[in-house]
Amino acid sequence: MVFNSGRYMRPHGWHAHRWHRGDRLPPDYRMQTYVIPDYATYGLRPPPPGYYWVRVDNNAVLAAVATGVVLDVAVNLFH
């Protein structure tokens, strides 16, 4: 299922990137603006302690709060 979650803008200076497990999200993507608090609405599993879901382009990325290290990616979840 693909969701329309409204307007989205990348942080200034960042371009599309295909994220993978082990990558590190830059701090700009770890701001509250990109956090997905209602992850269950989008069919995402609860994040483990110390992680959160963030929207990056059309994807939902599960990343560590402290470091931004990517644990998982839900590809093309948004349009």
Protein language model annotation of sequence segments:
Residues M1-H79:
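Low-complexity segments
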